[in-house]
């Protein structure tokens, strides 16, 4: 896996690690549309993901991440909203301007240690060249597309983050497919 940023959760700092793309990324549905799971945390991906996965194989995105065994690790999970936002902040693949919502709008979600809303140029394209759109090898790049989070929004929708403009959304769990990228936490 690869370092993908650091997040502070209740005073404890964690390094986020994204799984290798070849084994740790897939296009999946989130889960059954009319089923409210109750997993709505924006910071606790491990609890969200494990709980969702335990509900059965219909919860494709979380189950894919939870079932991953790579690099000698089995503690992979589908990230919560703030974890995925941190990954976008540090590994944004392209140069497209960000959505610049403010206040309580979509891009006001500011995971720690990030403490400001997005601007059109911040976050900028990652300096990790292997993760940039247009890299000679696309082996590590997070495509500029929508990624599921483990954060449920409603009975029929779950949160997504667009890795092109940073937009935050909520899409239908069972009729829409998006990317799922497995991550893990390591104490910083």
Residue map of PLM features:
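Short, compositionally biased
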Residues: 1-73, 90-93, 164-188
């Amino acid at each position: 896996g690869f370092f993908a940023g650091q997040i502070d959760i209740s005073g404890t700092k964690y390094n986020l690690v994204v799984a290798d793309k070849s084994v740790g990324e897939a296009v999946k549905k989130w889960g059954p549309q009319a089923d409210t799971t109750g997993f709505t945390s924006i910071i606790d991906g491990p609890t969200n993901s494990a709980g969702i996965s335990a509900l059965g194989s219909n919860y494709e995105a979380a189950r894919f991440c939870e079932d991953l065994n790579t690099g000698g690790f089995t503690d992979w999970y589908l990230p919560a909203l703030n974890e995925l936002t941190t990954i976008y902040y540090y590994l944004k693949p392209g140069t497209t301007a960000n959505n610049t919502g403010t206040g309580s709008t979509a891009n006001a979600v500011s995971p720690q240690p990030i403490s400001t809303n997005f601007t059109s140029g911040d976050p900028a394209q990652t300096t990790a060249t292997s993760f940039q759109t247009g890299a000679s090898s696309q082996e590590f790049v997070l495509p500029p597309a929508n990624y599921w989070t483990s954060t449920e929004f409603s009975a029929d929708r779950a949160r997504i983050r667009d890795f092109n403009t940073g937009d935050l959304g909520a899409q239908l769990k069972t009729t829409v497919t998006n990317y799922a990228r497995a991550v893990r936490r390591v104490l910083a």
